[in-house]
Amino acid sequence: MDNPFARFAGTRTIQANLSLLEENYVPDSFPHRENQINEMVTILSSIMRGSRPSNIIVYGKTGTGKTSTTKYVTKMLVEAASNVSVVYVNCEIYDSPYSILVAIANSAGEEKIPELGWPIDRIYRETVERVEKTGKFFIIILDEMDRLIKKNGGDSLYVLLKLMTDVDSVRVSMIGITNDTTVLENIDARIKSRLNQESIVFPPYNASEIRDIISSRLDKVLGPGVVDDTAINLCAAIGAQEHGDARKAIDLMRIAIEIAIRENRNKITENEIYEARERYEMNVLREAISTLPLHSKIVLLSAVVTQEIEPNSVITGEIYENYRRICDDLGFSPLSPRRISDLLTELADYGLLVMDDRNMGKYGRTRSFSVVHQAETIKKYLLEDENLSMFKSSKMPKQTRFDT
C-alpha cells in the first residue's frame, strides 16, 4: 500500500504560517484598541514610580481582544521593569482560592506546591513568603473571572485582596477579564468596596475594524494576492454579526486557508469561507455537546429520538418517558421529572433546543421543545460518548398522542 501521507508531501500551492492565526498567538499590533492599551498602560505605569497600581476589571464580549491586549501590555511592562512578575490564571481551570494561590506561589518559587493536600492557611503563608522573597510587583491576570465568582462567590477575590492588603511588603495587583458586566453584583459589598478597581471596556468590533485586523494578520501569514478581498469582507461581516467577534473571523480565515492547502487550491475565495463556517459551526456544536454532563446528554438524546418519532411537537412528558427508557436501557438511574424539566430549559439556554410555552386553555400550559440543529448530527455527536455508544434508537417505542 502506498503511504497515504505522500500526497501531502509535495510542494504546496499556498505557503502559510498558520501559527500566527492561532488563539494563543499575541500579535505586536492591535488595530482599534489603542485607547484601551493607553488606559491600561496609564494605570499600570504607577509600578514605574514604585507604587502598587489599582486593580483593573476588563469588560467585553468574546473576541473583542481583552485577553490578547492584556497579555501584550503586561509583556511590555515586564520588558520595561525587571521588578515585575505576571501570573496568568485561566479561571476555567484554576477555579478556587487554593488553586489560585498555588499558581501564584509556584510562579514565585522553584519548588512546586501540590495542587491538592495543603490546608488553605498553609498555602496562603507559603504564597506570602515566596512573593515577599522575590521583592517584585505581581500582576495576577484572572481570565474568565466570572467563572470563578459564579463557582465560589467572592471567596477567591477575598483571598487575593487579603494578599494585597494584609502585608505591606507584598505588592500584588489583579487584572480581571470578563464578558459579564454584572459580575461584581453578586459578591459581598465589603469585598467589592476593598477591590478599588478601575474598569476598561472593550466594545464590539464592527465589520470594517475586523477587516483591518484580519488584513494585518494576513500580511504576515500569506503572500500578497492569495486571499480575495471579497473573502476578507465576508469573514469580517460574519464576525461583526457575532457581536463583533474578531476571534471567530480569524478562526474562519485559518480554517479556510487549511481547506485551500489540503485541496491544493491557489486562492482563498468566498467559497472557502463558506466551507470554513460550516466546519466551524459543526466543531462548536460537537464541543458544546461533548462538554455536557451525562444526564444532560441523555435528555438531549431523548429529545432527538422523541422528535424522530413525533416530528411536529415534542412535549416535556414524552421526552421524560423516553429519557427514562434510555436510562433503563443503559443502566443509569433516572433523575426526577422536575430536574429533567430544568435540564431541558438549560439546553434551550445553550441554544441546543428551542422551547415553546403554549396556553392550552382549560388544559393549562404545555411546554414543547424542538432540536435546533440537524438531529442526526446531534445524535452522532452524542453517541461519541462511550456511556451512550450502546444506545439503539430502534428500541424506542412509537408513541400515540391524542392532540386536543
UniProtKB/Swiss-Prot annotation:
A biological process from GO: DNA replication
Pfam families assigned: AAA_22 (PF13401), Cdc6_C (PF09079), Cdc6_lid (PF22703)
SUPFAM superfamilies per the UniProt record, alphabetical: P-loop containing nucleoside triphosphate hydrolases, Winged helix' DNA-binding domain
Impact upon substituting residue 66 to E: Does not affect stimulation of helicase activity
Keyword ATP-binding among record annotations: yes
Binding site for ATP: 64-68, 205, 217
Keyword Aminoacyl-tRNA synthetase attributed: no
Keywords, sorted A to Z: ATP-binding, DNA replication, Nucleotide-binding
Superkingdom, natural source: Archaea
GO molecular function, one term: ATP binding
Entry domain remark: The N-terminal AAA+ ATPase domain and the C-terminal winged-helix (WH) domain are both required for stimulation of MCM activity.
Similarity section: Belongs to the CDC6/cdc18 family.
Protein name: ORC1-type DNA replication protein 2
Organism: Thermoplasma acidophilum (strain ATCC 25905 / DSM 1728 / JCM 9062 / NBRC 15155 / AMRC-C165)
